[in-house]
């Protein structure tokens, strides 16, 4: 689960991490009061969306002005004007896609007198099952670009969970950022606090970009991005309360209500499969035959008729879907249950696109019989290769 920048900074503040002072606003009329509380003389007006590249992004609406999603204001009047322009407008960044995201909240933050910018992040290293630090002197820009163009400027290391964070980890970060004396001590203290926060809140990723050194000699997190482990949210009701569903895909939210593993993709063939591995293979073979999947959807091993019906409705709700491939290998999941769910869903929502069904495994003959006698226009398939070829041909011929 992702949260907004201002929420991430509030979480870090709980652990004593130095972050800038600011106030979130939801209406343009709140901008003046927020700016006055901060005092000035410089303010930063930041769009709050779940996507990076806000500063270099552009708004779709001409009324929002030519500047990006992060703007420097040198007067309260400018803060008010930016708030009016940005709230409700659609911001397009390198991470939002062409559709962009509507800005429904802003973060008004005090300006900082910046001397240097750094990059610092913590993430779960799946290869070592440890928390990894990634550090660079090249802050304020895409770490992917740094890795591609100047990989020697990136330092990374993992923390042994048996020992936890130790002093030498902080000193490693300080050395990587060329910090000495008092600034090195600040870095060491910050590293310990960030690690503690990461573990305590079950984070997946914590990115500070940029981490800045002010001209007063203080380290400060100028931006913060946090992603939490969804499987651990039951332990953190305070974090659950920070969820902003307007930033999430409506179909993915609906799928989560039925414990369906669903991810929206940008293709045109909807997929319903049981098992993550089989789902990946199904998407691969669709790609092999020249088309792209519209989603990843794993209904799991013990899906009910109602769950299958819900899954089918979610797929058909996507206007980009031009065909549907259902690929089920029945083990715990029975093929007749899938068939009943598909028939019920089609009769309820209708079917305007080609549908190919491949069933194999437990109760397969009963499942095929249900579909055959349903009166629906369904193309049966004998195996995965046959199913992929049939759905691709049907969509191209439609």
Curated annotation (Swiss-Prot):
One of its GO terms (molecular function) is ATP binding. InterPro entries: ATP-grasp (IPR011761), ATP-grasp_succ-CoA_synth-type (IPR013650), ATP_grasp_subdomain_1 (IPR013815), SUCC_ACL_C (IPR005811), Succ_CoA_ligase-like_bsu (IPR005809), Succinyl-CoA_synth-like (IPR016102). It is an enzyme of class 6 (ligase). It catalyses: succinate + ATP + CoA = succinyl-CoA + ADP + phosphate; GTP + succinate + CoA = succinyl-CoA + GDP + phosphate. Substrate binds at residues 274, 331-333. The keyword Nucleotide-binding applies. GO terms for biological process: succinyl-CoA metabolic process; tricarboxylic acid cycle. Residues 9-254 form the ATP-grasp domain. One of its GO terms (cellular component) is cytosol. Belongs to the succinate/malate CoA ligase beta subunit family. Heterotetramer of two alpha and two beta subunits. This is Succinate--CoA ligase [ADP-forming] subunit beta. It comes from Rhodopseudomonas palustris (strain TIE-1).
């Amino acid at each position: 689960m992702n949260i907004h920048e201002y929420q991430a900074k509030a979480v870090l503040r709980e652990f004593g991490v130095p972050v800038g002072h600011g106030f979130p606003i939801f209406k343009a009329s709140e901008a003046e009061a927020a700016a006055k509380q901060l005092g000035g003389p410089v303010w930063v007006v930041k769009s709050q969306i779940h996507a990076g590249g806000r500063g270099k992004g552009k708004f779709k609406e001409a009324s929002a002005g030519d500047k990006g999603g992060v703007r420097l204001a040198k007067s309260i009047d400018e803060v008010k004007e930016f708030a009016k322009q940005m709230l409700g407008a659609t911001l397009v960044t390198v991470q939002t896609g062409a559709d962009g995201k509507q800005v429904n909240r802003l973060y008004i933050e005090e300006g900082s007198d910046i001397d240097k910018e750094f990059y610092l992040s913590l993430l779960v290293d799946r290869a070592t099952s440890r928390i990894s630090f990634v550090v660079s002197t090249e802050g304020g820009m895409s770490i992917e670009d740094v890795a591609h163009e100047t990989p020697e400027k990136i330092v990374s290391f993992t923390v042994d969970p048996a020992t936890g964070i130790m002093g030498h980890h902080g000193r490693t970060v300080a050395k990587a950022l060329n910090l000495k004396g008092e600034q090195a001590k600040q870095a060491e203290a910050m590293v310990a606090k960030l690690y503690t926060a990461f573990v305590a809140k079950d984070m997946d990723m914590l990115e500070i970009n940029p981490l800045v050194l002010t001209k007063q000699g203080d380290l400060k997190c100028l931006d913060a991005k946090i992603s939490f482990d969804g499987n651990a949210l039951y332990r953190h009701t305070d974090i659950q309360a920070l969820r902003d569903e307007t930033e999430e895909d409506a179909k993915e939210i609906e799928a989560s209500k039925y414990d369906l593993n669903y991810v929206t993709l940008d293709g045109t063939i909807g997929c319903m499969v049981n098992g993550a591995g089989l789902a990946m293979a199904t998407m691969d073979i669709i790609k092999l035959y020249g088309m792209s999947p519209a989603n990843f959807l794993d209904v799991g091993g013990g899906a009910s008729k109602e769950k299958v019906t819900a899954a089918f409705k979610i797929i058909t709700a996507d206007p980009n879907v031009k065909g549907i491939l259902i690929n089920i290998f029945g083990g715990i999941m029975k093929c007749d249950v899938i068939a009943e769910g598909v028939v019920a869903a089609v009769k309820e929502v209708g079917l305007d696109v080609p549908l190919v069904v491949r069933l194999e495994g437990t109760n397969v003959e009963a499942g095929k019989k249900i579909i055959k006698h349903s009166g629906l226009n369904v193309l049966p398939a004998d195996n995965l290769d046959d199913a992929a070829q049939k759905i691709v041909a049907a969509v191209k011929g439609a």
